[in-house]
């Protein structure tokens, strides 16, 4: 249904929002920035400063992983450069000049968050980290994630003359949706990120075991995929794909505490799962804090949302309302 509204558009949306808010109270989160995406209808169900540019640490690695899966074979042998071997902790300890199987590096990157694995993967596929970063940003752009700018494959903080390494909670949700469900390599991505333990033996006979740090896999029965992250700038971060009660959702939590608040992200994640599964209708409105002028045209074309019907994500990003700010 299409309706036309004039300058009272904000008041109209507020009225609708308040009536719907009564059904499901919004969660109070620790995260500075957060988003919850209804992945079946491409609608943001919850947002908190979700369009703010934020450092996102190792959650970057979900895009590194899917781009690697789409542009290489798991059997590829990856030769380690001096730069790859010299990456800071957390790292596997790759040896310069040695070659490792792509599959082993992907599991090391996604389960243990090893920075040297991510760097070696990037150099193997892109030729250089700079060119691989261009591949990441091109993929983000193809997904409509225009507020994402990645400079490193492992999420370590960096900046150039254009900007700093960042994304937004909204963009990160959309990236996870693509990784978990929409890519032709989503099945492989899910398999890697759902694995609790992975072991391999390198060519020197050293046995390695990787353990998955995504606690939501064991603390809930609905986690399809997830990735943690931390830097001193980004704080604790988390992105996940969730499927519960026939509903698919993606969540992103950025700036979710600093030491000693490592568990804040798990608390916030569970709150968003509860909120998302108890919300009967998906909805999206104008976010509080946006300037009135953004919606102050003499005539605006607005598509109303009804359950189980599609609405464009780009439209929803324009009309996103954080209801609790109106109380």
Regions found by a protein language model. Name each.
Residues 13, 47-49, 210:
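Short amphipathic beta-strand/extended segments with alternating polar/hydrophobic composition
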Residues 20-184:
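Active-site-adjacent loops and short helices of periplasmic peptidoglycan-processing enzymes
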Residues 2-25, 327:
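Sec-dependent N-terminal signal peptides of Gram-positive bacterial secreted proteins and lipoproteins
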Residues 8-9, 62, 244:
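Hydrophobic alpha-helical segments, especially transmembrane helices
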Residues 145-146, 161-327:
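Domain-terminus/edge residues, biased toward the C-terminal soluble/receptor-binding domains
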């Amino acid at each position: 249904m299409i309706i036309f509204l004039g300058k009272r558009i904000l008041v109209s949306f507020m009225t609708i929002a308040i009536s719907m808010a009564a059904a499901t109270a919004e969660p109070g989160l620790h995260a500075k920035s957060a988003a919850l995406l209804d992945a079946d209808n491409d609608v943001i169900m919850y947002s908190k400063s979700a369009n703010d540019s934020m450092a996102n640490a190792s959650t970057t690695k979900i895009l590194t992983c899917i781009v690697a899966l789409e542009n290489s074979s798991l059997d590829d042998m990856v030769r380690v450069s001096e730069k790859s071997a010299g990456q800071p902790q957390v790292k596997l300890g790759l040896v310069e000049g040695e070659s490792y199987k792509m599959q082993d590096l992907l599991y090391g990157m996604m389960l243990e968050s090893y920075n040297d694995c991510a760097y070696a993967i990037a150099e193997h596929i892109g030729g250089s980290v700079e060119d691989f970063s261009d591949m990441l940003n091109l993929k983000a752009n193809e997904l409509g994630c225009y507020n994402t700018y990645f400079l490193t494959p492992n999420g370590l903080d960096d900046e150039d003359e254009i900007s700093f390494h960042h994304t937004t909670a909204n963009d990160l949700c959309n990236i996870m949706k693509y990784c978990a469900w929409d890519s032709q390599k989503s099945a492989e991505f899910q398999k890697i990120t759902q694995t609790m333990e992975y072991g391999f033996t390198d060519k020197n006979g050293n046995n390695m075991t990787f353990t998955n740090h995504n606690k939501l896999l064991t603390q809930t029965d609905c986690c399809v995929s997830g990735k943690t992250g931390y830097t001193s700038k980004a704080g604790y971060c988390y992105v996940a794909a969730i499927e519960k009660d026939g509903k698919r959702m993606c969540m992103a939590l950025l700036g979710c505490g600093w030491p000693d608040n490592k568990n804040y992200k798990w608390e916030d994640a569970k709150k968003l799962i509860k909120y998302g599964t108890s919300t009967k209708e998906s909805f999206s409105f104008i976010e509080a804090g946006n300037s009135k002028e953004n919606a102050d045209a003499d005539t605006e074309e607005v598509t109303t949302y009804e359950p189980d019907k599609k609405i464009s994500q780009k439209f929803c990003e324009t009309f996103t309302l954080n209801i609790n700010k109106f109380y």
